[in-house]
Amino acid sequence: MGIFSGLFKSRDKPQNSYDSPSYTYFFGRANSGKRVTDRTALQHIAVYACVRVLSEAIAQLPLHVYKYNEKGKERVPQHPLYFLLHDQPNPEMTSFVFRETLMSHLLIYGNAYAQIIRNGRGDVIGLYPLMPDKMKVDRDEKNRLIYIYSRYDEANPNLKEQGDIVLYADEVLHIPGLGFDGLVGYSPIALAKNAIGISIACEEYGASFFGNIVLSRLGFAFFQTFGSVQSSDSSAP
């Protein structure tokens, strides 16, 4: 049984992007001394432009539901999921806004999550985005994937109570980006935080430099004017 023991052992837990010891360099202080987070990174014009352009481009692409038959595949506009994906995934969002939101999450955090809402018969009736920075991917005692979501200041109307909630794989639409285990993606912002930190530092230095020049010129102009007034007063009889 020794040769086959490796085939039947349980899979390792997913390498969670946010609390894994091997990924302690997630959002945080860069070598430039600047703290790089999802919010500060988006204030950098290059990061914001990339996220905006890619998110809007993906959100504009056509999204249809197909089924396979003996001739290949055909579009199925009457399928129940067609309306959710193509038109309105939930009463608060259009398909464009929903896909734009998920794509921006994927670009910033490396993962995009959406809660799958079902009716009593098990039919999917809604999709709501979940914030990736509040999600932890793990395995339960039966080695099943679980999603532990922290409900603090939550905007999702389906998660009203505060605290942690456990969602199973059939309750979450998870789109991971590039990662080492194929389950959890790594944040592009975190991986490039030193480059972004340098850009933020340069922007702040430039703004401070030009701000000091303006103040210096104002001070020089003030003293020039004040000095000329004093001179004219002293020369008066």
Tell me the role of every PLM-derived stretch:
Residues M1-P237:
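Structured, contiguous alpha/beta core segments that scaffold functional sites
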